[in-house]
């Protein structure tokens, strides 16, 4: 069973996200700095009758990268073509996609850091010169043919900008860092989504869902649907603070947006390893989760919120973790004042 607080897209998200997506940049909630920059760049490109510079959107999953790509395509008057790094296995597949584009179209490549290197090299002339270099024949008879491409915009999305090669990263003219949303921004998103769903909700109910959504609109909309279900069965269909709290407690999503596995990790570090440090492999074995799952799924948000600290010797529980679980920290010297080390997006 998938986690309801999983930031990555789940099957149930696909259709609902389509209906909830804003169509214009001024309808997009949150990411104010990103919106302001993109609005200026889009207007400037349209005034010059040029395509928008190739754009890289990076940050945690679920923050609206695909939605922004769709908005950019609409603002530029082009179509949006969506694919992903893992889906393009051969250079010919990417070439086929590129040759179907028209002027001002947007090609959106999700997880662009996972592109095959041979495929990636096809992008270099496409991004720099709007051209595609194709080699025909083999050996001494081989010759290169250049095919002109339309003036399109490539939008790459990644959760790990540090994994992009320098040649690819340097070819993006616009780089936008997507940040976690505030509770107030998420409350606005929840209220808007409730209107689309035909669900009555109070401000307090919307804020309670927002607070437990891990700064992520995708999770907020997912929780809203489950709270709506609870309210329709258990009460008068109005999602109030009471219904929101009861539904979220039933879903085992606490007031920090943590689920039972998040709390299990914190409990293991504090109760079984005296607050740490504990090696990630030992922690993985102890809680029964794969090492990669802990590093990629659970740990990033706990690090970002400052509940655990990553050190060369292992993971340490911060003062916030002790407070959250109602424990007394008898080894505060280990907590390094609760500061999070490093950036987990650049691993």
UniProtKB/Swiss-Prot annotation:
<keyword id="KW-0227">DNA damage</keyword>
<dbReference type="Pfam" id="PF05491">
    <property type="entry name" value="RuvB_C"/>
</dbReference>
<dbReference type="InterPro" id="IPR036390">
    <property type="entry name" value="WH_DNA-bd_sf"/>
</dbReference>
<dbReference type="GO" id="GO:0009378">
    <property type="term" value="F:four-way junction helicase activity"/>
</dbReference>
<dbReference type="InterPro" id="IPR041445">
    <property type="entry name" value="AAA_lid_4"/>
</dbReference>
<keyword id="KW-0067">ATP-binding</keyword>
<comment type="subunit">
    <text>Homohexamer. Forms an RuvA(8)-RuvB(12)-Holliday junction (HJ) complex. HJ DNA is sandwiched between 2 RuvA tetramers; dsDNA enters through RuvA and exits via RuvB. An RuvB hexamer assembles on each DNA strand where it exits the tetramer. Each RuvB hexamer is contacted by two RuvA subunits (via domain III) on 2 adjacent RuvB subunits; this complex drives branch migration. In the full resolvosome a probable DNA-RuvA(4)-RuvB(12)-RuvC(2) complex forms which resolves the HJ.</text>
</comment>
<feature type="region of interest" description="Small ATPAse domain (RuvB-S)">
    <location>
        <begin position="182"/>
        <end position="252"/>
    </location>
</feature>
<feature type="binding site">
    <location>
        <position position="310"/>
    </location>
    <ligand>
        <name>DNA</name>
    </ligand>
</feature>
<feature type="binding site">
    <location>
        <position position="315"/>
    </location>
    <ligand>
        <name>DNA</name>
    </ligand>
</feature>
<feature type="binding site">
    <location>
        <position position="171"/>
    </location>
    <ligand>
        <name>ATP</name>
    </ligand>
</feature>
<keyword id="KW-0378">Hydrolase</keyword>
<feature type="binding site">
    <location>
        <position position="66"/>
    </location>
    <ligand>
        <name>ATP</name>
    </ligand>
</feature>
<dbReference type="GO" id="GO:0016887">
    <property type="term" value="F:ATP hydrolysis activity"/>
</dbReference>
<dbReference type="InterPro" id="IPR003593">
    <property type="entry name" value="AAA+_ATPase"/>
</dbReference>
<dbReference type="GO" id="GO:0005524">
    <property type="term" value="F:ATP binding"/>
</dbReference>
<feature type="binding site">
    <location>
        <position position="66"/>
    </location>
    <ligand>
        <name>Mg(2+)</name>
    </ligand>
</feature>
<keyword id="KW-0238">DNA-binding</keyword>
<feature type="binding site">
    <location>
        <begin position="128"/>
        <end position="130"/>
    </location>
    <ligand>
        <name>ATP</name>
    </ligand>
</feature>
<dbReference type="Pfam" id="PF05496">
    <property type="entry name" value="RuvB_N"/>
</dbReference>
<dbReference type="GO" id="GO:0000400">
    <property type="term" value="F:four-way junction DNA binding"/>
</dbReference>
<dbReference type="InterPro" id="IPR004605">
    <property type="entry name" value="DNA_helicase_Holl-junc_RuvB"/>
</dbReference>
<keyword id="KW-0234">DNA repair</keyword>
<dbReference type="GO" id="GO:0006310">
    <property type="term" value="P:DNA recombination"/>
</dbReference>
<keyword id="KW-0547">Nucleotide-binding</keyword>
<comment type="function">
    <text>The RuvA-RuvB-RuvC complex processes Holliday junction (HJ) DNA during genetic recombination and DNA repair, while the RuvA-RuvB complex plays an important role in the rescue of blocked DNA replication forks via replication fork reversal (RFR). RuvA specifically binds to HJ cruciform DNA, conferring on it an open structure. The RuvB hexamer acts as an ATP-dependent pump, pulling dsDNA into and through the RuvAB complex. RuvB forms 2 homohexamers on either side of HJ DNA bound by 1 or 2 RuvA tetramers; 4 subunits per hexamer contact DNA at a time.</text>
</comment>
<feature type="compositionally biased region" description="Low complexity">
    <location>
        <begin position="329"/>
        <end position="339"/>
    </location>
</feature>
<feature type="region of interest" description="Disordered">
    <location>
        <begin position="328"/>
        <end position="347"/>
    </location>
</feature>
<feature type="binding site">
    <location>
        <position position="21"/>
    </location>
    <ligand>
        <name>ATP</name>
    </ligand>
</feature>
<dbReference type="InterPro" id="IPR027417">
    <property type="entry name" value="P-loop_NTPase"/>
</dbReference>
<feature type="binding site">
    <location>
        <position position="62"/>
    </location>
    <ligand>
        <name>ATP</name>
    </ligand>
</feature>
<comment type="similarity">
    <text>Belongs to the RuvB family.</text>
</comment>
<feature type="binding site">
    <location>
        <position position="181"/>
    </location>
    <ligand>
        <name>ATP</name>
    </ligand>
</feature>
<feature type="region of interest" description="Head domain (RuvB-H)">
    <location>
        <begin position="255"/>
        <end position="347"/>
    </location>
</feature>
<protein>
    <recommendedName>
        <fullName>Holliday junction branch migration complex subunit RuvB</fullName>
        <ecNumber>3.6.4.-</ecNumber>
    </recommendedName>
</protein>
<keyword id="KW-0963">Cytoplasm</keyword>
<dbReference type="GO" id="GO:0006281">
    <property type="term" value="P:DNA repair"/>
</dbReference>
<feature type="binding site">
    <location>
        <position position="218"/>
    </location>
    <ligand>
        <name>ATP</name>
    </ligand>
</feature>
<dbReference type="InterPro" id="IPR008823">
    <property type="entry name" value="RuvB_C"/>
</dbReference>
<dbReference type="InterPro" id="IPR008824">
    <property type="entry name" value="RuvB-like_N"/>
</dbReference>
<feature type="binding site">
    <location>
        <position position="65"/>
    </location>
    <ligand>
        <name>ATP</name>
    </ligand>
</feature>
<dbReference type="GO" id="GO:0048476">
    <property type="term" value="C:Holliday junction resolvase complex"/>
</dbReference>
